[in-house]
């Protein structure tokens, strides 16, 4: 197995953060990201970049973090008990984008690297990440294109890669208490190291680089779509699912909070405005009901493109 090079991973992640922020500023056309660097008492730190009240994006947060610690947190050792007691180093770029227009989907992406060390033993390391899409008023062609981009970036690494990580994404971004997926999925991978450092790193780079390629065309296509109070109210209601998932199920959120991460950066994924409504049910045969009937259970989206 090739030896992990932490400095090369960090350089890529910092560059990725910059490129994604540049791309989002270009899409917005007005607002700019504000950078906020922070240090963590136990070791490490990061830079959070947040764009607010833009022409296109109500809020977009793109966070880089590189943290170190003397012992692995419970969230990381729950499914890897053999790592308990090891020192660790974790770095990644994580982003969530909440658009103004309900016809533009919310999106999330994350790429990360983790290494755990113990004197007298080989380091244990892995990559993880992915991206997913959460529409409010979905367009089938947008969802198919999103999955086509995900498929195409996976293909050089093997034909089995996209179906495997697409299913993992569907399974991960699922709310059991609602019996629905958070959105229409994408890719999710974790514990990636079996192919060695170089190949694993190359795949993580492909996912990071592929995010804007997949998301930007959807934003361009939908950003001028007219909407009213009804659509806005539905968007705010559905944003509640984002909050529910992130605070109850998301491993990254739990890891950040358990390792003494910076709370503001961890919770910047939260939508700036959100609403809940008791016993809400969409009107039958309405555009809102289409989301529930056609988009919140896993589908083979690429088969619909044939």
Curated annotation (Swiss-Prot):
Pathway named in the protein's UniProt entry: Porphyrin-containing compound metabolism; protoporphyrin-IX biosynthesis; protoporphyrinogen-IX from coproporphyrinogen-III (O2 route): step 1/1
The protein's role, per its UniProt record: Involved in the heme biosynthesis. Catalyzes the aerobic oxidative decarboxylation of propionate groups of rings A and B of coproporphyrinogen-III to yield the vinyl groups in protoporphyrinogen-IX.
Gene Ontology MF, one: metal ion binding
InterPro entries: Coprogen_oxidase_aer, Coprogen_oxidase_aer_sf, Coprogen_oxidase_CS
Organism listed in the record: Shewanella woodyi (strain ATCC 51908 / MS32)
Protein name as catalogued: Oxygen-dependent coproporphyrinogen-III oxidase
Catalytic residue list: 108 (proton donor)
Stretch list, region Important for dimerization: 242-277
